[in-house]
Amino acid sequence: MAQQGDGNSEPTEVAAEYLMTIRYMHGEGQPVIAARLAERLGVSAATVSEMVTRLGREGLLSVEPESRQLNMTEAGRTAAERTFRRHALSEWLLTEVIGLGWADADEEAHHLQHALSDRVTDRIDELLGRPPTCPHGNPIPRDGQTPERPVGRALSEAAAGSDVTILRVTEEAEEDARLLTFLQENGVRPGHVFEVVDVATHIGTMTLRRVASGAHGGHEVTIGLVAAAKLRILEGRADQALFHRVPERARLAATG
């Protein structure tokens, strides 16, 4: 275990990535076994086995004897939630204050999340207005509590002719840099409203039209149903109070 400057014991960067991935998989309702974890991380089964043993020794992970499912201990969940909070706040800082794109910000946040102390993380949180979610709409845990959010349903299930509000981009979608860039460039982000123009199941796509005033209104985007299944929506035009907007003071702080 590594030591942070504020005196808190932290898992190493690699260990934190394992815990974060397990957290994501549990959040998707997937039973986590070593083989699935290796596939998700793109590493060998032997590498995962070695890390699982290490995390078990450090009291962060347990393995069910019969099913071989991997479960985080309370200490493991705490470590994963702390890392995710730092990652999410870093993404807000990088996208809304510094101006990076979603994909670049996600990559940079993986570096920042291991460098921030709790003190600095708390100050960033305050500067950003304590966002309840990451920029992609996934809830940020604080003090062991995760804010209640609507569950929503997959965009791929929406019917032609309906209006939908983007609720969140799942962690699975966040792992695809090209998809993140595509979504950002086309305004498919939490809080934005679209009309489902067409669902072409025979070719596996759906077409959306942005519902907004000004230049952004009427923009059409065609997205694959496989990608749409990784997005969550609310039916109709949802209350915009659900969606965080970074305070102007944060942007002013960046420009001096």
PLM regions with names:
Residues 1-42:
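Extreme N-terminal segment that seeds HTH/winged-HTH DNA-binding domains in transcriptional regulators
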Residues 46, 103:
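Key DNA-contact positions within bacterial/archaeal DNA-binding proteins
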Residues 52-53:
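Short, hydrophobic-biased segments on the C-terminal half of alpha helices
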Residues 56-65:
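A short, conserved structural fragment
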Residues 67-87:
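Basic, amphipathic "hinge/linker" alpha-helix immediately C-terminal to the N-terminal HTH DNA-binding motif
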Residues 113-228:
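Mid-protein regulatory/catalytic core that forms ligand/cofactor-binding pockets
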Residues 217-256:
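Glycine- and charge-enriched low-complexity intrinsically disordered segments
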